[in-house]
Amino acid sequence: MAVSHSVKERTISENSLIILLQGLQGRVTTVDLRDESVAHGRIDNVDAFMNIRLAKVTYTDRWGHQVKLDDLFVTGRNVRYVHIPDDVNITSTIEQQLQIIHRVRNFGGKGQGRWEFPPKNCK
């Protein structure tokens, strides 16, 4: 997973099920869209706002016409449903993604590197 660069995006991801979709990167799945069309392809990227970038896509519109596309960007607002593949262990996928986020948040160990949330000096 490419970890989100902003603190806001990482916070949104770890406090929602977006983290599960981010764990599906590299897998082939189907995304149902609000306009009743369907996109089937490999998930390349999912950001904290559920924007999804798919590769090698078969796009089917609501009338059943199919188009093959190299890539497709779907805004989170247009996503109705993302099909989770049967072979995905949901619990372990979420735990792996949380570990990645916490590794980025705490990189460098204690007293090293940068702090995203430096401790406040209480007096």
Swiss-Prot record:
Q: Where is it located?
A: Nucleus
Which key words are in the record? mRNA processing, mRNA splicing, Nucleus, Ribonucleoprotein, RNA-binding
User: Which Gene Ontology BP terms does the record give?
Assistant: mRNA 3'-end processing by stem-loop binding and cleavage; positive regulation of G1/S transition of mitotic cell cycle; RNA splicing
InterPro entries per record: LSM_dom_sf (IPR010920), Sm (IPR047575), Sm_dom_euk/arc (IPR001163), U7_snRNA_Sm-like (IPR052840)
Lineage: superkingdom? Eukaryota
Q: What is its main location?
A: nucleus
Sm domain mapped to chain residues: 16-88
Q: Does the keyword Nucleus apply?
A: yes
UniProt's post-translational modification comment states: Not methylated. Methylation is not necessary for interaction with SMN.
Q: What is this protein called?
A: U7 snRNA-associated Sm-like protein LSm10
Q: Which organism is it from?
A: Homo sapiens
- Source organism phylogeny: Eukaryota, Metazoa, Chordata, Craniata, Vertebrata
Which gene specifies this protein's sequence? LSM10
